[in-house]
Amino acid sequence: MHQFVRVGFLVAALGTVAVTSAASQLLEQPEPDRSTSDPVMLILRGIANSESPRGQLDDGAALQYAWYAGFRGEVLDVAGNTGPDSLQVRMTLDRIRDDPSIAAIYGFSGGGYNARHVWAGLTAAQRERIRRVIVVGSPGVAASDFPGMPYVVIKPDPREGHMAGPKALLQWEAGPEAPLELGE
């Protein structure tokens, strides 16, 4: 009798471990990537420095924001040195002209200043495809810099500092308990 009880207990314990393990794995699965057919939010980095030679940005928070906003985020992998003829502006204009799935622009710091130049360089038809413009940490950039765009979000630097801007924007969109990475 005692052996049957022990075996029964062991089977129940193993079953509990298996169910707990399976549930744990389900919880740890990241959110599925947005389909390549989903609209794209093109994310523009800030200016480069010695720590971020390709441009400053909290990539994770910016991509998470795009996801929460209903877009597939893509970080344009070039520093946001500013100006209408900068490499970032030229690359962004080329991407928008060549890729009809781009439906939003997110600019951080120097990328936010460049978002103005990008908007000015778009044709009326290209502007109609853009559904949202986001600018974070770019003092002096205003919604009026994007005429005809009904959905513009301009966020100043938070108290935590310039580099905390993308995370603060994410928490504004998704709430203060927003996970820092998809799937958390």
Regions found by a protein language model. Give the residues of each.
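Bacterial N-terminal signal peptides that target proteins for export
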Residues: M1-F9
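Bacterial N-terminal signal peptides
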Residues: G8-V17
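Membrane-interface motif at the C-terminal end of an N-terminal transmembrane signal
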Residues: A18-E28
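Active-site catalytic motif of lipid deacylating hydrolases and related acyltransferases
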Residues: L26-S101, E160-L169
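Residues at the C-termini of beta-strands that transition into short coil/loop
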Residues: R45, A79, G137, K155-P158, ...
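C-terminal catalytic histidine-bearing segment of alpha/beta-hydrolase fold enzymes
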Residues: I154-E184
